[in-house]
C-alpha cells in the first residue's frame, strides 16, 4: 500500500513500520486486505538514545543502520479542485475541515521531519549466552513508551541455559504484544494477529510445560511487536468485546480452581 502526504508517496510492504510525524496531512491507500497495528503518540517517535552518539549518528552496536530508514519516494502534482475533507485530531476528538484544493498540493518541501519506514526484517536480533530481557530488543522510543521487535534469532547458547523467557512482573509498565508471524514458543493459544496485554504488577511468563520443552532449542522463528507503556492502559469497549476470557486461565492446569472476579470498573480480573 501507499501512505500519501504533503511529502509525497511512500509505499510500504509487509513488515514495515511506517512513522508519520504529528501534524502531517496524510491518507493511506491499501492494496487488498491488510492487518495493521497502530500506535498514536503525543510526541516524536525516536531512535533510542543508547543507539546514537552525541551527534545523532547511529553507533556500530545499533541493531539497524541509517540506510534501513526510508523516506518518501515521489512527490506528485495535485491540481484537482473541489471539496476535500480533512479530519484533524485534537486531543481526544476530531475536527473536520473542507478545503477547495487538494491538501497535498505543494511545490516541494525541505527539512528533516518527514514520514519514514523501517522494516522489522532489517532489525538485527539481539542474542546472548543467557536469556536477553525483552527491553534489549527496543526499536523505537516515544513519550512514556517504547516499541520492541522480536525477530528470528539464535537462542541462548550457554550449555545450562533455558532458552525461554523467565517469569517476571513489569512493575512500572504495561506490556502489549502483537503477534505478527511465526511460531511463538513461550505462549499457548496464540496465533498470527493475536494481541496480549499484561498489566503492570501481574506475574507472567511461559505457559506450563513450555520451559521444559524449550531445552535443546537453538533458534526461534517469530515476529512480534511489543509496546511497553509507563502509564496504565485502558481497554476500549471494542477491546472488551474482543477479549478472550480463556487466555488468563491458560496458565492453570486442570483442577487448579481458578476463578474470575468482576471489579467495579467492569474489567474482569482472573485469579
Per-range role (PLM):
Residues 1-271:
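Jelly-roll (double-stranded beta-helix
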